[in-house]
């Protein structure tokens, strides 16, 4: 499947949040996903919100996630991406740190 010159193995992908630290994207691609999205990645490392940060709402059969984008930061993510061993579409979900200046 082709979209804007990007060649996807198929249309089924794995969205951001599963591999927040960019440590398993090659292995996940080997499972057959058409694309992998890592992150959320912020410019600087951050630990995320204090625990508990995931809450179950039994009455609604749902979860609330307030993880706070815990990740090792952009520099570490760039190193891990540089070691990528396979060719596939890799997306990166990005956000700013709470201390970042500029637009919200």
What are these regions (language model features)?
Residues 20, 40-42, 94-98:
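Active-site-proximal loop/turn and secondary-structure-junction residues that shape catalytic pockets
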Residues 8, 16, 29, 68-86, ...:
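Conserved alpha/beta-domain cores
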Residues 39-89:
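A gly/proline- and charged-residue-enriched helix-loop-helix capping module
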Residues 1-23:
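Active-site-flanking structural segment that lines cofactor/substrate pockets
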């Amino acid at each position: 499947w082709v979209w804007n010159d990007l060649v996807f193995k198929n249309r089924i992908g794995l969205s951001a949040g599963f591999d927040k630290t960019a440590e398993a994207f090659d292995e996940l691609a080997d499972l057959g996903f058409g694309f992998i999205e890592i992150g959320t990645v912020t410019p600087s490392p951050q630990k995320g919100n204090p625990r508990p940060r995931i809450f179950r709402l039994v009455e609604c059969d749902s979860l609330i996630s307030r993880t706070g984008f815990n990740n090792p930061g952009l520099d570490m993510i760039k190193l891990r991406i540089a070691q990528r061993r396979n060719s596939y579409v890799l997306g990166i979900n990005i956000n700013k740190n709470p201390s970042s200046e500029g637009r919200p």
